[in-house]
Each structure stands twice: as structure tokens, then as C-alpha cells.
């Protein structure tokens, strides 16, 4: 997993509560277990005017010009802001894969569905929780002055707007370490490779019959 590096990006405001995983990546696109290739279908039903199909070239599909991701100022955004209960619905990890594949590295919301929240950390996406008053302020900032940027500093646990407003967020130390060092479940397991090998060797000595090739 790629290490999380502090960065500055335009903010993508999606002023909705209860954005579910089927809205993030519709069910018809869940046929692949690869983590890439989902970005074109992120928010597919909101982003396009037609019904998308798996494997379809999205470059010629009719766009919904009112949707935020189709507006030029927001297309390169890496920070998404929404309201409470983001990522609710089914537990598909593809939802985080789609956000990550599009380029979004941080989501800021009032709250999250638990499974989605934990899936973010396993895929290099930072889910920030802010009080509803702070979320309101971010949407008001966009409404008042248009597109704005934020600096995301995971080391200091701050999100700072280009006008200098600083928002501090809480973060579990272990999850923070995993993001900063790029550690997913496999990488965490491989940190104990020596202990695992030693255990396997010991078991082969203690119960050798468990390791016999029964196909012969």
C-alpha cells in the first residue's frame, strides 16, 4: 500500500447525508476483485446520464453537467467532504477502491459506517471525522467563495483551508502509523515473517504427520 503523504488539494463538496456504497460504486461494477479500474464508475449514477455497463469505455458517455465531479474546478480533487453516515449500506470494499482509484485520498464527514471507515485505512484513504458545525463551515466556504483547497497534514492531524482556517481531527495512533508507513493487512503480517517461519518449523518437528503429502 502506498504511504500517505501530506498534500494540498481542491475540496470536492458533496452536500449529502447517508451516501451509501451503492451510490459510490453501483453493484453492477463489482465483478472484479482487482483494486484498480473503478475510478471511472465512481458515483456512476450521479455522474452520467445513461446506465453504465461493466467494462464500458466511459469517455464517450453523456455526463451530468450538474454533478460536482464533472465540473472542471473539482476534477483533480483529492479531498471529498460530505455529511454524516458516509459509506453506509452494503459492506463492499469496492467503494473505497473506487474513491482511491479516482484519486481521492481523504474523506471528511460527520460520521461513517463502521465497515467503510475501517476499509479506508486498509486501502490508504484517510477518513476524517469533524463536528457537524465544522462540516457546515466547509460547505458554507464553498458556497461563499467557490472552490477552495485544503492542506491535509496527517502527522499533525490537521486540515487547513487556503484561507488559514485549521481543523484538528482525532486519529487512532495505530491506524495513523499504518497510513503513514503504507501498511495494509498483508504488510502487517509480513512484519512477523520470522516468527511465522519459526512456528512452522517447530510444528513440523512436533507433529510431522500433519505435513505429509497425502496425494502420494
Residue ranges and their predicted role:
Residues 1-83, 87-115, 119-216:
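Cytosolic catalytic domains that perform sulfur/thiol-centered chemistry
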Amino acid at each position: 500500500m502506498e504511504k500517505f503523504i501530506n498534500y494540498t488539494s481542491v475540496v470536492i463538496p458533496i452536500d449529502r447525508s447517508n451516501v451509501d456504497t451503492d451510490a459510490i460504486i453501483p453493484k453492477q461494477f463489482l465483478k472484479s476483485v482487482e483494486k484498480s479500474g473503478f475510478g471511472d464508475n465512481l458515483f456512476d449514477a450521479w455522474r452520467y446520464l445513461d446506465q453504465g455497463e461493466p467494462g464500458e469505455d466511459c469517455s464517450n458517455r453523456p455526463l451530468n453537467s450538474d454533478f460536482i465531479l464533472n465540473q472542471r474546478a473539482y476534477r483533480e480533487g483529492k479531498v471529498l467532504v460530505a455529511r454524516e453516515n458516509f459509506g453506509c449500506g452494503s459492506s463492499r470494499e469496492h467503494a473505497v477502491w473506487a474513491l482511491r482509484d479516482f484519486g481521492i485520498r481523504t474523506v471528511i464527514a460527520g460520521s461513517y459506517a463502521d465497515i467503510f471507515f475501517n476499509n479506508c485505512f486498509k486501502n490508504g484513504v484517510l477518513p476524517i471525522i469533524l463536528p457537524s458545525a465544522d462540516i457546515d463551515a466547509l460547505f458554507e466556504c464553498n458556497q461563499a467563495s467557490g472552490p477552495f483547497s485544503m492542506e491535509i497534514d496527517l502527522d499533525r492531524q490537521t486540515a487547513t483551508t487556503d484561507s488559514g482556517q485549521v481543523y484538528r481531527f482525532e486519529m487512532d495512533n495505530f491506524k495513523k502509523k499504518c497510513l503513514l508507513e503504507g501498511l495494509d493487512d498483508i504488510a502487517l503480517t509480513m512484519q512477523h515473517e520470522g516468527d511465522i517461519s519459526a512456528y512452522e518449523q517447530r510444528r513440523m518437528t512436533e507433529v510431522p504427520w500433519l505435513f505429509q503429502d497425502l496425494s502420494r
